[in-house]
Amino acid sequence: MNLRQQLGSGLSMAMVLASAFAFWKLFSIVTMSNSPIVVVLSGSMEPAFQRGDVLFLWNREEYVGVGDVVVYKLQEKDIPIVHRVVREHRVMEKDRKTKKKVQKQLLLTKGDNNERDDLPLYAYGQQYLERKKDILGRVFGYVPLVGYVTILITENVYFKYALMALLGLSALVQDE
């Protein structure tokens, strides 16, 4: 393979990666969610969602209601959690920047397959999730079991190495 072909292959790969990144950013802007697509990692939401389901999030609503399934991130952890809103209330607070009173929505969540609410998961002293600060989005659609590839890659080291070897082998075979 000559230099021109290598540069062409590299440019093609860069275009694929740039297109994927652009699609992700566009989807993030449209849904107003930093994480518009998530994979269910546990069975806490069964039977509504199974482990491995891919969820699509929407974060354009001002408020979410009791019964809505939301995805939130805890302050200390990087893993998004998919649970249902079981209680909500609103409080009036003074906005720090504008000094005007604003209504803030507070939420309590629980997994459908869990016996108790999520209070023990929240940060020490935190009673509720704040809609604007903690919620990544409300679930508006899903694709069953497609996310199992992600789970296999993160949980099984051998699968990850086999997949990388397969990708490397396919790149070598394609070049010939």
UniProtKB/Swiss-Prot annotation:
Q: Where in or outside the cell is it found? A: Endoplasmic reticulum membrane
Give the membrane topology. Answer: Single-pass type II membrane protein
Taxonomic superkingdom: Eukaryota
One cellular-component annotation, GO: signal peptidase complex
Q: Which residues lie on this side of the membrane: Lumenal?
A: 31-176
State the Gene Ontology BP annotations: protein targeting to ER; signal peptide processing
Query: What are the catalytic residues?
Result: 44, 83, 118
The protein's matches in CDD domains, at most eight in alphabetical order, are given as: S26_SPase_I
- Cytoplasmic compartment residues: 1-9
GO terms for MF: serine-type endopeptidase activity
Segments for region (C-terminal short (CTS) helix): 162-173
Catalytic activity line of the entry: Cleavage of hydrophobic, N-terminal signal or leader sequences from secreted and periplasmic proteins
Q: Which keywords does the record carry?
A: Endoplasmic reticulum, Hydrolase, Membrane, Protease, Signal-anchor, Transmembrane, Transmembrane helix
- What EC designation does it have? 3.4.21.89
- State the InterPro entries in the record: LexA/Signal_pep-like_sf, Pept_S26A_signal_pept_1_Ser-AS, Peptidase_S26, Peptidase_S26B
* Membrane-crossing residue ranges in chain numbering: 10-30
Report the PANTHER family cross-referenced here.
SIGNAL PEPTIDASE COMPLEX CATALYTIC SUBUNIT SEC11
Q: What is known of its domains?
A: The C-terminal short (CTS) helix is essential for catalytic activity. It may be accommodated as a transmembrane helix in the thinned membrane environment of the complex, similarly to the signal peptide in the complex substrates.
The subunit field of the Swiss-Prot or TrEMBL record says: Component of the signal peptidase complex (SPC) composed of a catalytic subunit SEC11 and three accessory subunits SPC1, SPC2 and SPC3. The complex induces a local thinning of the ER membrane which is used to measure the length of the signal peptide (SP) h-region of protein substrates. This ensures the selectivity of the complex towards h-regions shorter than 18-20 amino acids. SPC associates with the translocon complex.
| Functional description taken from the UniProt entry | Catalytic component of the signal peptidase complex (SPC) which catalyzes the cleavage of N-terminal signal sequences from nascent proteins as they are translocated into the lumen of the endoplasmic reticulum. Specifically cleaves N-terminal signal peptides that contain a hydrophobic alpha-helix (h-region) shorter than 18-20 amino acids.
What protein name does the entry list?
Answer: Signal peptidase complex catalytic subunit SEC11
